[in-house]
Protein backbone atom coordinates (compact mmCIF):
# COMPACT_ATOMS: atom_id res chain seq x y z
CA UNK A 1 0.00 0.00 0.00
CA UNK A 2 1.59 3.27 -1.13
CA UNK A 3 0.14 5.23 1.81
CA UNK A 4 2.02 2.92 4.18
CA UNK A 5 5.30 3.26 2.27
CA UNK A 6 5.19 6.35 0.02
CA UNK A 7 8.96 6.51 -0.61
CA UNK A 8 9.29 2.71 -0.91
CA UNK A 9 11.65 2.78 2.07
CA UNK A 10 10.29 -0.39 3.61
CA UNK A 11 9.78 -2.30 0.36
CA UNK A 12 13.39 -1.59 -0.66
CA UNK A 13 14.52 -2.59 2.83
CA UNK A 14 12.52 -5.82 2.69
CA UNK A 15 14.13 -6.70 -0.64
CA UNK A 16 17.52 -6.08 0.97
CA UNK A 17 16.61 -8.31 3.92
CA UNK A 18 15.47 -11.05 1.52
CA UNK A 19 18.81 -10.75 -0.30
CA UNK A 20 20.72 -11.00 2.99
CA UNK A 21 18.76 -14.10 4.06
CA UNK A 22 19.22 -15.79 0.67
CA UNK A 23 22.94 -15.07 0.48
CA UNK A 24 23.54 -15.99 4.11
CA UNK A 25 22.46 -19.55 3.26
CA UNK A 26 25.23 -19.74 0.63
CA UNK A 27 27.94 -19.20 3.29
CA UNK A 28 29.87 -17.00 0.87
CA UNK A 29 30.73 -13.31 1.11
CA UNK A 30 28.27 -10.98 -0.59
CA UNK A 31 27.95 -7.31 -1.43
CA UNK A 32 24.71 -5.38 -1.13
CA UNK A 33 24.16 -1.74 -1.99
CA UNK A 34 20.88 -0.14 -1.03
CA UNK A 35 20.03 3.16 -2.68
CA UNK A 36 16.91 4.64 -1.13
CA UNK A 37 14.81 7.38 -2.72
CA UNK A 38 14.69 9.00 0.69
CA UNK A 39 15.92 11.49 1.81
CA UNK A 40 14.94 13.29 -1.37
CA UNK A 41 12.09 15.25 -2.86
CA UNK A 42 9.19 14.65 -2.92
CA UNK A 43 9.14 14.77 0.84
CA UNK A 44 6.87 11.90 1.86
CA UNK A 45 6.55 9.67 4.91
CA UNK A 46 4.12 7.31 6.58
CA UNK A 47 1.15 8.90 8.31
CA UNK A 48 2.25 7.42 11.64
CA UNK A 49 5.63 9.10 11.24
CA UNK A 50 4.05 12.48 10.50
CA UNK A 51 1.97 12.13 13.66
CA UNK A 52 5.09 11.37 15.70
CA UNK A 53 6.57 14.78 14.82
CA UNK A 54 3.37 16.81 14.56
CA UNK A 55 3.51 18.12 18.13
CA UNK A 56 7.28 18.75 18.23
CA UNK A 57 8.51 22.31 18.55
CA UNK A 58 10.28 23.44 15.40
CA UNK A 59 13.41 25.52 15.12
CA UNK A 60 14.40 28.25 12.68
CA UNK A 61 16.07 25.84 10.25
CA UNK A 62 14.84 22.43 11.38
CA UNK A 63 11.19 23.14 10.80
CA UNK A 64 10.16 20.61 8.16
CA UNK A 65 7.79 18.03 9.62
CA UNK A 66 7.86 15.95 6.43
CA UNK A 67 11.64 15.83 6.33
CA UNK A 68 11.79 14.75 9.97
CA UNK A 69 9.17 12.05 9.36
CA UNK A 70 10.92 10.76 6.23
CA UNK A 71 14.28 10.70 8.05
CA UNK A 72 12.62 8.74 10.86
CA UNK A 73 11.27 6.19 8.36
CA UNK A 74 14.70 5.76 6.78
CA UNK A 75 16.35 5.40 10.19
CA UNK A 76 13.80 2.77 11.19
CA UNK A 77 14.46 0.80 8.00
CA UNK A 78 18.21 0.81 8.65
CA UNK A 79 17.42 -0.55 12.10
CA UNK A 80 15.53 -3.44 10.47
CA UNK A 81 18.63 -4.32 8.45
CA UNK A 82 20.86 -4.14 11.53
CA UNK A 83 18.39 -6.36 13.41
CA UNK A 84 18.51 -8.93 10.59
CA UNK A 85 22.32 -8.94 10.54
CA UNK A 86 22.32 -9.52 14.31
CA UNK A 87 19.65 -12.23 14.09
CA UNK A 88 21.71 -14.11 11.50
CA UNK A 89 24.95 -13.60 13.48
CA UNK A 90 26.60 -11.90 10.52
CA UNK A 91 29.34 -10.46 12.70
CA UNK A 92 31.89 -10.28 9.88
CA UNK A 93 29.80 -7.68 8.07
CA UNK A 94 30.70 -4.13 7.17
CA UNK A 95 28.00 -1.54 6.82
CA UNK A 96 28.74 1.75 5.07
CA UNK A 97 26.20 4.55 5.31
CA UNK A 98 26.48 7.74 3.31
CA UNK A 99 24.73 10.12 0.95
CA UNK A 100 25.36 11.22 -2.61
CA UNK A 101 25.25 14.96 -2.01
CA UNK A 102 24.25 17.75 0.33
CA UNK A 103 20.83 19.36 0.48
CA UNK A 104 19.35 21.66 -2.09
CA UNK A 105 20.51 25.06 -0.79
CA UNK A 106 17.19 26.86 -1.16
CA UNK A 107 13.85 25.12 -0.89
CA UNK A 108 10.83 27.38 -1.14
CA UNK A 109 9.47 29.20 0.79
CA UNK A 110 12.97 29.95 2.15
CA UNK A 111 14.09 33.28 0.74
CA UNK A 112 17.61 33.46 2.07
CA UNK A 113 20.51 31.06 2.10
CA UNK A 114 20.87 31.59 5.85
CA UNK A 115 17.51 29.83 6.24
CA UNK A 116 18.55 26.79 4.17
CA UNK A 117 19.08 23.25 5.44
CA UNK A 118 22.79 23.47 4.63
CA UNK A 119 23.55 26.69 6.48
CA UNK A 120 26.27 27.47 7.59
CA UNK A 121 27.89 25.24 4.94
CA UNK A 122 28.51 26.93 1.62
CA UNK A 123 25.91 26.23 -1.12
CA UNK A 124 24.58 22.73 -1.70
CA UNK A 125 23.63 19.77 -3.87
CA UNK A 126 24.98 20.76 -7.28
CA UNK A 127 28.05 22.64 -6.05
CA UNK A 128 31.57 21.35 -5.39
CA UNK A 129 31.58 23.36 -2.17
CA UNK A 130 31.20 22.14 1.39
CA UNK A 131 27.40 22.20 1.31
CA UNK A 132 27.38 19.99 -1.76
CA UNK A 133 30.00 17.44 -0.83
CA UNK A 134 30.02 17.27 2.97
CA UNK A 135 27.80 14.30 3.75
CA UNK A 136 27.67 11.68 6.50
CA UNK A 137 29.97 8.70 6.05
CA UNK A 138 29.59 6.03 8.70
CA UNK A 139 31.37 2.68 8.66
CA UNK A 140 30.55 -0.17 11.01
CA UNK A 141 32.31 -3.52 11.08
CA UNK A 142 34.45 -5.97 13.04
CA UNK A 143 37.75 -4.09 12.55
CA UNK A 144 36.31 -0.60 12.92
CA UNK A 145 36.95 1.35 16.11
CA UNK A 146 33.45 2.28 17.34
CA UNK A 147 34.64 5.44 19.06
CA UNK A 148 36.70 6.80 16.15
CA UNK A 149 35.72 10.06 14.51
CA UNK A 150 37.59 11.59 11.61
CA UNK A 151 37.32 14.89 9.80
CA UNK A 152 39.49 13.60 6.95
CA UNK A 153 37.77 14.12 3.59
CA UNK A 154 37.25 11.00 1.50
CA UNK A 155 36.27 10.41 -2.10
CA UNK A 156 33.84 7.73 -3.17
CA UNK A 157 36.21 6.94 -6.05
CA UNK A 158 38.60 5.61 -3.39
CA UNK A 159 35.98 3.41 -1.79
CA UNK A 160 36.08 0.37 -4.11
CA UNK A 161 39.76 -0.45 -3.44
CA UNK A 162 39.06 -0.16 0.29
CA UNK A 163 36.10 -2.55 0.06
CA UNK A 164 38.24 -5.01 -1.93
CA UNK A 165 40.95 -4.83 0.75
CA UNK A 166 38.40 -5.44 3.51
CA UNK A 167 37.04 -8.44 1.60
CA UNK A 168 40.55 -9.91 1.56
CA UNK A 169 41.19 -9.85 -2.18
Each language-model region and where it sits:
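Substrate-binding rim/cap in mid-to-C-terminal beta-strand-loop elements of soluble/periplasmic
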Residues: 55, 79-86, 116-169
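Catalytic-site neighborhoods of secreted/periplasmic enzymes
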Residues: 1-2, 121
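Metal-dependent active-site segment of extracytoplasmic phospho-/sulfohydrolases and closely related
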Residues: 35-36, 72-110, 138
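Active-site His/acidic residue clusters
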Residues: 16-66, 104-105, 110-112
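A long, amphipathic alpha-helix that forms part
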Residues: 7-24, 51-93
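Active-site-proximal beta-strand/loop segments in catalytic clefts of secreted hydrolases
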Residues: 34-38, 46-47, 98-101, 133, ...
Amino acid sequence: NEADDPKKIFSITQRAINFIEKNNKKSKPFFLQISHYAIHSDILARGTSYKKFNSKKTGKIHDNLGLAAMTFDLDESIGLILDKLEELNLENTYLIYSSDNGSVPIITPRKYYEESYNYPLSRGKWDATEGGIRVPFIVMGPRVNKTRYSETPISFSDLLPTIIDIAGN
